[in-house]
Amino acid sequence: MTGSGKTVTRVDLCEAVYKKVGLSRTESSAFVELVLKEITDCLEKGETVKLSSFGSFMVRKKGQRIGRNPKTGTEVPISPRRVMVFKPSAILKQRINGNSNGNGADTKAD
């Protein structure tokens, strides 16, 4: 599951659980689906999902605003909506950027 530019799918996650945890393929698939369903259910209710050393998924409300049709330039109202946001932890940011000092401190001011 490593490599530049690869998209990791549900099947890849299930296979990783199968190989690393030792569950059957059916159990691994059920486990991955259960975790994803729980995260989805929490987000639908507007709850924040915080995974230590990984990051937080949260739902934010966006108010109505005026946008523009790029073809015509006409102003168009954009309805209020909820959007899902992921905020990576400092540890994940460090791992992605190759800073593996492991203390969890963020080296860049956000």
UniProtKB/Swiss-Prot annotation:
Protein name in UniProt: Integration host factor subunit alpha
GO biological process, one term: positive regulation of metabolic process
HAMAP family, per the entry: IHF_alpha (MF_00380)
Protein origin, superkingdom: Bacteria
Subunit structure: Heterodimer of an alpha and a beta chain.
Pfam families listed in its UniProt record: Bac_DNA_binding
Protein family: Belongs to the bacterial histone-like protein family.
InterPro entries hit by this protein: Hist_DNA-bd, Histone-like_DNA-bd_CS, IHF-like_DNA-bd_dom_sf, IHF_alpha
Gene3D superfamilies assigned: IHF-like DNA-binding proteins
Gene: ihfA
Signal sequence annotation: none
Example GO molecular function: structural constituent of chromatin
The entry's keywords: DNA recombination, DNA-binding, Transcription, Transcription regulation, Translation regulation
Gene Ontology CC annotation, any one: cytosol
Function, in words: This protein is one of the two subunits of integration host factor, a specific DNA-binding protein that functions in genetic recombination as well as in transcriptional and translational control.
UniProt xrefs under PANTHER family: DNA-BINDING PROTEIN HU (PTHR33175), INTEGRATION HOST FACTOR SUBUNIT ALPHA (PTHR33175:SF2)
